[in-house]
Amino acid sequence: MDNIILNVAINLINCHKNKFSLIFPKYFNKSKELLRISEQESKILFSNEFIKNNIKFAVEVPTESKHMQTGKTPKSARFDLVTYKNDCNFDWVIELKSKNPPLKHFTKDFEKMVLTDTNCIWFHTLKNSDKGTFDVLIKKINIGINEKINNFIGKHNWKIIFVVLEKRKLYTLDLLLESKKYDQIKSIDQFKKKEL
């Protein structure tokens, strides 16, 4: 999975630099951002890597667990991407994010992830970053995981990934998580950093 993550990160940067067939589209309103940076490009690039490597996967996969994220009736939520083992059980759950979403987006996704009993990837695309950006995002990750860790099923690997397009950097942190056991991420310095 690490090579696939690396390839997706490289291709995202190439999309941003218009050196790939997939590009980030332009905004046509008076947005201060010129390009729309979203998780959709990551979803396509991961899908391409899975197809190229003959890895079974699905998109927008219903969760087995029920969640009440809107309305009054608990329902299945959706994972952005899931890869499968040969026996058709989940291998990796992948949740995609971009920019700096509200805290509730973190807790909503971590709620799904802790209940899935499999390995998980949090893949986050940023146009740019500084220490303050990472401090804010890491705080949201810590809060989101801490709120849900008591419900964690099993003992699994989680990968927290940041791709910073303009700086051409990939940040990776591998965590082993289980119920009631989570050591807070202290800073971006804990992550492996790779120049792309």
Predicted regions and their residues:
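Acidic-residue sensor for enzyme active/binding pockets
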Residues: 39-41, 60-64, 95
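Active-site metal-binding core of divalent-cation-utilizing nuclease and nuclease-like domains
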Residues: 34-35, 56-88
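Hydrophobic, Leu/Ile/Phe/Ala-enriched alpha-helical segments that form helix-helix packing faces
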Residues: 12-20, 46-54, 113-117, 138-153
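Catalytic cores of nucleic-acid endonucleases
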Residues: 89-148
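Hydrophobic anchor at the start of a short beta-strand
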Residues: 57, 118-121, 160
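Interdomain/boundary linker segments immediately adjacent to catalytic/signaling cores
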Residues: 1-52
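Residue-level detector of short, conserved catalytic/binding motifs and their immediate flanks
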Residues: 42, 79, 92
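Domain-level recognition of nuclease-like catalytic cores that cleave nucleotide substrates
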Residues: 127-196
